[in-house]
């Protein structure tokens, strides 16, 4: 079974600035990029070996994987102090995801069966990693809403502490959601691949 874990260096730092009075504003900034690593092979075993030797590593492990998603959080918040109280004026959470996928360089001349298996596997790897990126974006939006909903505090220093606490708890929840997704995906991998292959066989006329 192939596992497709994500690699996630997480960094979230909020800067503090005192702003003029105005309505609270939010702006999640999400960017996504793709990069590829090359594999070669004419058999399923060769491709599997190439994925194991050329794939990206996960954080804290030397093991290589068929795909990965690097995720980096960041952000800042500004505050308004008026009437002896400090509130959040604006918050911006940023999340950058880099999806790393395999690219089969010498596919030409490979058997139709191997090509079909690879198409099913590579599409599943891509879907899996893009879902990791989606989870990160969704969590960034949740964190932003939670920061903007914080009640006014007596000082902006205290408000900064609350913002930091929200961001820390948000990152922890993000990690739990990502780990849960990986566990579910691993359990369902075999059935998912069988379904993908059957669908591709039907599409290509493999069933009579």
Language-model regions: role of each:
Residues 86, 90, 96-143:
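Mid-length scaffold segments of soluble, non-membrane domains
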Residues 21-26:
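Sec/Tat signal peptide C-region and signal peptidase I cleavage site
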Residues 127, 131, 135-148, 152, ...:
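Sec-exported extracytoplasmic/periplasmic mature domains
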